[in-house]
Amino acid sequence: MSAERLVNPHSDSDDQQVEKSLRPRTLSEFIGQEKVVEQLRIAIAAARGRNEALDHTLFYGPPGLGKTSLANVVANEMGAKIKITSGPAIERAGDLAAILTNLQPNDVLFIDEVHRLNRAVEEVLYPAMEDFALDLVVGKGPGARSLRLNLPRFTVIGATTRLALLTSPLRDRFVAVHRLVFYSDAAMTEIVSRSARILGVPISPEGAREIGRRARGTPRIANRILRRVRDYAQVVANGEITLAVAREALAQLEIDELGLDENDRRLLRAIIELFNGGPVGLNTLAAALAEEVDAIEDVYEPFLLQLGFLQRTPRGRVATRRAYEHLGLPFPERSLPLEDESGPQQGTLF
């Protein structure tokens, strides 16, 4: 999958630089995810009222929905410092120990991709989260002894796109677990308008709405598209993003009315044209598209499932009637129920 794909919800280096300037600082500035925000507001107010660290918190959901932003907001609301790291970055137990021993009372430790922590690191994290203690082994061989080092009370905020990959012991140590969902069109419009204001881009309400509704319910994608449409407006128009300018730019970027790009349409056409609409196994589909299995599961499928264009069945992926209609293809009337169909092209599910 190309790193330049606009509707890829995963972050890249350019996104990270811009996102810092666009990131909300308080819960009142955070747009969308109303249930999560309200629960956090109550939890933060209670923790501050008791002068305690916030309970360990886990955010999960598709990428680009604001898990890192919420972690920063929580730290700001708590008046605490935040240390940001990720599961793959903590390779050894000693790496985690070094981070933990530098935390101050009520600090926030944000671990992105927390499901990718290795087992040795998790073993160190368990007592740190539960007892606010660090168990160290001093020495080697018969003379080795265990030493427990007390830690200040702090908050671990974990973020993951793959909740099922978290081990049960780690998941159980998060007191609060919040699921982030795709944003509504109204919230996306508000996010685009806010980002344009911060970036100094003139935009009409209709232009903001057009970008927002094609951004797949994902703020990161909306902000990325906004920057590209801004460039188009600057060069082709008078610099203002109107409805007409937004539509012209999005057409040039090959992002359709529902936010699908050519890669999404290629996946749907592959299922329909190469595998008779499915079912087709994930590995088979990945091979046909020359894509990674993880890319299909993490990047393509969540939004296609949300739209109802794709179904996951025990025997593989299936394109729905909606997918056929969106691509302008006739939907075949099946003589047998889907679960009874067979064919040499179905592949394997895993």
Curated annotation (Swiss-Prot):
Return one Gene Ontology term, BP aspect: DNA recombination
Q: Which organism is it from?
A: Chloroflexus aggregans (strain MD-66 / DSM 9485)
Give the start-end ranges of region Head domain (RuvB-H): 257-350
Assembly and partners are described as: Homohexamer. Forms an RuvA(8)-RuvB(12)-Holliday junction (HJ) complex. HJ DNA is sandwiched between 2 RuvA tetramers; dsDNA enters through RuvA and exits via RuvB. An RuvB hexamer assembles on each DNA strand where it exits the tetramer. Each RuvB hexamer is contacted by two RuvA subunits (via domain III) on 2 adjacent RuvB subunits; this complex drives branch migration. In the full resolvosome a probable DNA-RuvA(4)-RuvB(12)-RuvC(2) complex forms which resolves the HJ.
The record's keywords, sorted A to Z, are: ATP-binding, Cytoplasm, DNA damage, DNA recombination, DNA repair, DNA-binding, Hydrolase, Nucleotide-binding
Record's comment describing the protein's domains: Has 3 domains, the large (RuvB-L) and small ATPase (RuvB-S) domains and the C-terminal head (RuvB-H) domain. The head domain binds DNA, while the ATPase domains jointly bind ATP, ADP or are empty depending on the state of the subunit in the translocation cycle. During a single DNA translocation step the structure of each domain remains the same, but their relative positions change.
Q: Which GO terms describe its molecular function?
A: ATP binding; ATP hydrolysis activity; four-way junction DNA binding; four-way junction helicase activity
Location of the region described as Small ATPAse domain (RuvB-S) in the Swiss-Prot/TrEMBL record: 184-254
This molecule's function is given as: The RuvA-RuvB-RuvC complex processes Holliday junction (HJ) DNA during genetic recombination and DNA repair, while the RuvA-RuvB complex plays an important role in the rescue of blocked DNA replication forks via replication fork reversal (RFR). RuvA specifically binds to HJ cruciform DNA, conferring on it an open structure. The RuvB hexamer acts as an ATP-dependent pump, pulling dsDNA into and through the RuvAB complex. RuvB forms 2 homohexamers on either side of HJ DNA bound by 1 or 2 RuvA tetramers; 4 subunits per hexamer contact DNA at a time.
Catalysis performed (reactions): ATP + H2O = ADP + phosphate + H(+)
Q: What is its main location?
A: cytoplasm
- The organism's superkingdom is given as Bacteria
Sequence positions that bind ATP: L22, R23, G64, K67, T68, S69, E130, D131, F132, R173, Y183, R220
Residues annotated as binding Mg(2+): T68
Provide the residue span(s) of the region labelled Large ATPase domain (RuvB-L). 1-183
Q: Which compartment or compartments is the protein found in?
A: Cytoplasm
Keyword Cytoplasm part of the UniProt annotation: yes
Signal peptide, first to last residue: none
What is this protein called in UniProt? Answer: Holliday junction branch migration complex subunit RuvB
Q: EC no.?
A: 3.6.4.-
UniProt: DNA binding residues? R312, R317
First-tier enzyme category under EC: hydrolase
Q: Which SUPFAM superfamilies match?
A: P-loop containing nucleoside triphosphate hydrolases, Winged helix' DNA-binding domain
Fetch the CDD domains from UniProt. Answer: AAA
Q: Name one Pfam family in it.
A: AAA_lid_4
